[in-house]
Amino acid sequence: MQQINMADSTRNETAVEEEMRPRAANEALRKLWTTQTLGIAIGCLLLMNFFMNLTVYTQNVYEPYATSHFDGHSLLTTGSIIAGIVRIVSYPLLAKLANHFGRPQGFAGAAVSMAIGNAMYASCRNVDTFLAGTIFDAFGDSWWNIVQQIFVADITSLVNRGILFTLPESLSAIPTLYGGTYLGEHILTTSSWRWGYGMWAIVLPVTAIPTIGIMIWMNRRAKHVGLSNEKVSFMHGASSGPIGKVKHIATQLDLIGALLLIGGLAMTLLPMTIAGRNNTDRWSRPSSIVLIIIGVLTFVAFLVWDGKFASNPIIPYRTIRERNVIIACASVITIAMSDSIYRPFLSSFLQVAGHYSPGAATRVDNAQRVAYNIGALVCGVTLKFVKNTKPTIMLGVVLIILASGLPIYLTNISGTHIASEPAFITSKSLLGVGRGFAQVSLQVSLQAVMEYEQVAIATAVYLSSVGLGSNLGVTISGAIWNSLLPRKLVAFFGEEDGRKIFGSIVVAREYEVGSAERNAIDECYRQTQQTLAIGSVCVSGVLLVLVYLVRNVKLDAEDEKRAAQADEELAWAIKQKEAKEDAPIELEEGRR
C-alpha cells in the first residue's frame, strides 16, 4: 500500500513538474547555438547556395543544346512551365514535411532530389526522362529553399534574421550570375552538356553534407541537455494493417488537402502560364477556360476541407487569418505581379526600339538581380539597428513605386526615342533595391507574429505568393503585348509583313536604323512597352494601401520576450536532465 502511494506521489510530482514547464523548447534550442557554431552553419549554407546558383546559371547555357538534341521538342517548354508550377505549389507540403521529419532530413531529401534531377538530365535518352528530371530538380530546389528559410528562423533572433536570411543567397548569387556563364561555356568546349548536368549530381549532395552534419551535431547537443524535440513517433496512433497505416499517414500529412491545393493551383496556373507571353490565342479555347474554372472550384474545395474537415490542415486558418500574414502575402503578390507585367518583353524591346545589343539588354536585366541581393542584405543590416519592420517596408514600397513609374518616361521619351542604357540600369537597380527592402522586411514581420510551430507554413504560403504574383503578371503582360503590338504593326505594314515583324525580333532588327520602316517599328514597340509600364505602376500603387495596413513589429521587444521564455525552458530542461542522470551539465561558452 505504501509502495502504491509512493508511486502515485512520484507520478503527481512529475505531472506538476510538467505543468510548470515553460513550453518554449524551440526558443531554448536557439540558446545552444554559439557564435562559432552559427558562423559554421551560415558558412555551410553559403557553400551550398553558391553551388546551387552555379548549377542554375550553367544549366541556362546547356539548355539550348539539350533542346537541340531533342529537335526542339515542344514538350520541353511545357516541362519548364510545369517545373515553375511545382515550385509554387510544393512549398506548403514541404513545410509540413519539415515540421514532421526535421531539418536535416529535409536538407538531405532536397539534395538527393536535385541530384536525381541532374542525373536524369545527363542520362536521358528521350524527352520524357528530361521532363521528369526537370520536375525532380525543381522540387529539390524548392525543398532546400523552404527548409533553409525555416532553419534560419530556428537559429536566429528576429533582429538578426533579416541579415541571415539574405547572406547565403546574396553573397553567392552575384559571382555565380556571371561565373556560371563562363563555366558553362568552358564545359561545353571541353566536354558535353551531358557531363555539364551530370557533374552536379555528384557536387550537390557532397556540398550539402556540411550543412546536414552541423545540424545533426547540434541536435545531439540538444539531447545532451534535455532539450530534444520530444516528438511522438510519426506512426503513433496508427491502426494495425497497411490500410490503417495509409489512412494515418494521409491524416497526419493532410494528403487530401495537399492534393486539392496542388490540383487547384496547377489547373489554375497551367493555362495562364501556357497562354502567358506568346500564346494568348489559347484564351479563345474552351479547354483553357474550363481548366481555370475547375482549378478555382478545386481550390475552394481545399479551403472547405482544411477549414471544416481536416484534423491536421496543411494550412491552418489561424495562420492565414493573422493580419501581417495576409498583408505580407498580398504585398508580395502585388510586387511580383507589377514587376512581371513590365519585365517579360523588356529585352526584346531594348534590342528593337533601343537598338541595344543582346549583351546590353542582358546587363539591364541583370542589374535588377544584383541590386535585389544587395538591397536585401542592406535591409537585413538596417533591421538590426532600426529594430522596427514598418520603416524598411515603407522605404521599399516607395522605391518600388518610383522605379515602376520611371519607365513610363524612359520607354518613350517625347514620343521619339528611349533612354540610354545607364538610365535603364538605374531604374532597374532602384526596383531591385526596393524589392529587397520590402520583401525581406515583410518576411520578418510575418514570422515575428507567428508561434514557432506555424512559422514554417506561414513562410511557405509567403514564398508561394511570390510565384503566384509572377504568373499573374506574365499572363497580363502577354495579353497586352500580343494584343497591342501586332495590331499596331499591321496598321503600318499590312497583315502579312506586320505578322512577320511581330513574330521575330530578328526580322524587326533587319530594317535599317533611321529608315521610315524602322522608325515605325520602333514607335510601335515604344508605345506598347509604355502601356506595360503604365499597367505596372498602376498595380504597384496598391502597395500604398497595404503598407498602411501592415502592423509594425518591434523586433527587440519581441526578442526579449522570447529570450526570457527560452532561458526558463533551458533552465527547466537542464534541471530535469541533471535530476535523471545525477550529474551536472555544463554548457558551452559563447551561447547567444
Q: Could you describe each region identified by the protein language model?
A:
Residues 194-327:
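Hydrophobic transmembrane-helix bundles of small-molecule transporters
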Residues 93, 97-256:
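Helix-loop-helix hairpins in multi-pass membrane proteins, especially solute transporters
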Residues 44-47, 54, 59-62, 71, ...:
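Transmembrane core module of solute transporters
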Residues 66-67, 97-98, 121, 130, ...:
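Interfacial helix-cap and linker-helix signal at transmembrane-aqueous boundaries
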Residues 2-11, 508-592:
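Transmembrane-helix exit segments and adjacent C-terminal regions of multi-pass membrane proteins
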Residues 89-103, 188, 375-391:
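Helix-to-loop junctions at the C-terminal end of transmembrane segments
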Residues 162, 176-188, 424-502:
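Small-residue-rich alpha-helical segments with characteristic i,i+4
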Residues 1-59, 68:
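Cytosolic juxtamembrane N-terminal segment immediately preceding the first transmembrane helix
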